From Swiss-Prot:
Lysosomal proton-coupled steroid conjugate and bile acid transporter. Preferentially recognizes lipophilic steroid conjugates or bile acis as endogenous substrates and seems to mediate escape from lysosomes to the cytoplasm. Modulates hepatic cytosolic copper homeostasis, maybe acting as a lysosomal copper transporter and sequestering copper ions in the lysosome. Delivers pathogen-associated molecular patterns to cytosolic pattern recognition receptors as part of the innate immune response to microbes. Residues 26-70, 125-133, 192-195, 283-294, 346-347, 404-415 are extracellular. It is found in: Lysosome membrane. Coiled coil: none annotated. One of its GO terms (molecular function) is symporter activity. The gene is SLC46A3. This is Lysosomal proton-coupled steroid conjugate and bile acid symporter SLC46A3. It is a multi-pass membrane protein. It catalyses: estrone 3-sulfate(out) + n H(+)(out) = estrone 3-sulfate(in) + n H(+)(in); 25-hydroxyvitamin D3 sulfate(out) + n H(+)(out) = 25-hydroxyvitamin D3 sulfate(in) + n H(+)(in); cholate(out) + n H(+)(out) = cholate(in) + n H(+)(in); glycocholate(out) + n H(+)(out) = glycocholate(in) + n H(+)(in). GO terms for cellular component: lysosomal membrane. It comes from Bos taurus (Bovine). InterPro entries: MFS, MFS_trans_sf.
């Protein structure tokens, strides 16, 4: 019996990714720490080997470890950049004809293989440089962006009514927040109670169950497209996609082109900063003067997941009293404040308190997606969001690589520099929002949507 629900797939995937991310970072940190010198880290805590006194010999040693870890993360991110970008573009564009299960299966196989390799790597204490090769090979099968893109496309295929689609997507956001929050909260206890090998094995089992569900139980959302699979080649698929993208901007008026490009630029720059700096939090928390252990890192990860709930509540409440662009301003400004506060956080209490300004971090992304959907025709929504997914994949991988490189170069003389830089860079989307406000006020807000609705009313008459 086939099941037409992709929600269990997303829940298992979010659990695996949320648990695997801090596991991998802390495992690499411990391995590089032990390989760089004669110091070792007890599994129960890392605070015994984290020096807060700058005159201590361990202090200079841990600065070197921080630099090596961030450089290693940079190498891993770069190794998966090109194959991840190409595979995401190829698999998602092909799914319009080949079905949504195709990218879901491939990306799940890649994630499963990578997780199984981490189990072997940690069990046999193999050289961690092999992680770079496994990241490259795994990216050939797609990445997490590929998986999520196919999952949301699966939901869109099923939901013909806009209201039903909104409810399903809202449920996904809710599940994403719940699963990632609970997993982040428990990740430290997984490491402390089970160790790295068993923790990686749990991730592998979750991904294996996920793959079995997709292969045997998940119903394909595009049954009618099976007859088109032979007649439509990959070359034609690429040509059609590029042609639709070209026509999307060619057919728009000058004002619409300007507004659309500004919205895309604003969203990608904001996405670049927030995604790029997010992996640095774990390294920052492991280093002095915080010297967090795995449990505290899990608490911090769980608090970071609260932003999914708070941003959703913020949009729901603010939508009654302000425009979309004002909500984007609030989210950008509060995130900017949070970045600046993080740069000067020197105690555990302060590091927990800096999570408060990040409560609306996701809000600008959701609002900007909504604004983008309002400036293009209903028949061009798919093409626009395909472009957006491509830019997010490119920007996300590039951002993580860039910020890891910056942190590696600056950790010795200013640990919080990368967060101060992030706060400054957020001025770019803030200024861009001001320009959007000015342009939309002069040309009329969401001109195309109004014209489209009026033309539909005229045709109905």
């Amino acid at each position: 019996m086939k099941i037409p629900f992709v929600e269990p797939v997303i829940c298992l995937s979010v659990f695996a990714v949320t648990l695997n991310s801090p596991l991998t970072t802390q495992y690499v940190y411990r391995r590089i720490w032990e390989e760089t010198g004669n110091y070792s880290i007890a599994l129960e805590s890392n605070t015994s080997e984290c020096a807060k006194n700058k005159s201590s010999p361990i202090f200079a040693f841990q600065e070197e470890v921080q630099k090596k870890v961030s450089l290693f993360n940079l190498e891993m991110d770069i190794s998966g950049l090109i194959p991840g970008l190409v595979s995401t573009f190829v698999f998602l564009s092909h799914s319009d004809h080949g079905g949504r299960k195709f990218p879901l299966i491939l990306s799940s196989v890649g994630a499963l293989a990578n997780s199984a390799w981490l189990c072997l790597l940690s069990y046999f204490a193999l050289p961690i440089q092999l992680l770079i090769a496994s990241t490259f090979i795994g990216a050939l099968f797609g990445n997490y962006t590929t998986f999520l893109g196919a999952s949301f496309a699966y939901i869109v295929d099923q939901c013909k009514e806009k209201k039903q689609r909104t409810i399903r997507i809202a449920i996904i956001d809710f599940l994403f927040g719940v699963v990632s929050g609970l997993t982040g909260l428990s990740s430290g206890y997984f490491i402390r109670g089970l160790g790295f090998v068993w923790s990686f094995l749990i991730v592998t089992v979750a991904l294996f169950v996920n793959l079995i569900y997709i292969l045997l139980f998940l119903e394909d959302s595009m049954k009618e497209s099976s007859s088109q699979n032979i007649s439509v080649s990959w070359t034609e698929t690429f040509k059609n996609l590029f042609h639709r993208t070209y026509m999307l901007f060619k057919n728009a008026s000058g004002e619409q082109q300007s507004l659309c490009c500004l919205l895309l630029f604003t969203m990608i720059t904001y996405f670049f900063v927030t995604i790029g700096v997010s992996p640095i939090f774990v390294l920052y928390e492991l280093d002095s003067p915080l010297c967090w252990d795995e449990v505290l890192i899990g608490y911090g990860s769980a608090l970071g997941s609260v932003t999914f709930f708070s941003s959703f509540l913020g949009i729901w409440l603010f939508s009654y009293c302000m425009e979309d662009i004002h909500m984007a301003f609030i989210g950008t400004f509060t995130t900017m404040v949070g970045m600046a506060m993080t740069a000067f956080a020197r105690t555990t209490l302060m590091m927990f308190l800096v999570r408060l300004p990040f409560l609306f971090t996701v809000m600008p992304l959701s609002v900007l997606r909504s604004m983008i959907s309002k400036v293009v025709h209903s028949t061009e929504q798919g093409t626009m969001f395909a472009c957006l997914a491509f830019l997010e994949t490119l920007g996300g991988i590039t951002a993580v690589s860039t910020f890891n490189g910056i942190y590696s170069a600056t950790v010795a003389w200013c640990k919080g520099f990368v967060f101060l830089l992030s706060a400054v860079l957020l001025l770019i989307p803030a200024i861009s929002l001001c320009v959007i406000k000015y342009v939309s006020r002069n040309t009329g807000s969401y001109v195309l949507l109004i014209q489209e609705e009026s033309s539909e009313d005229t045709s109905d008459r």
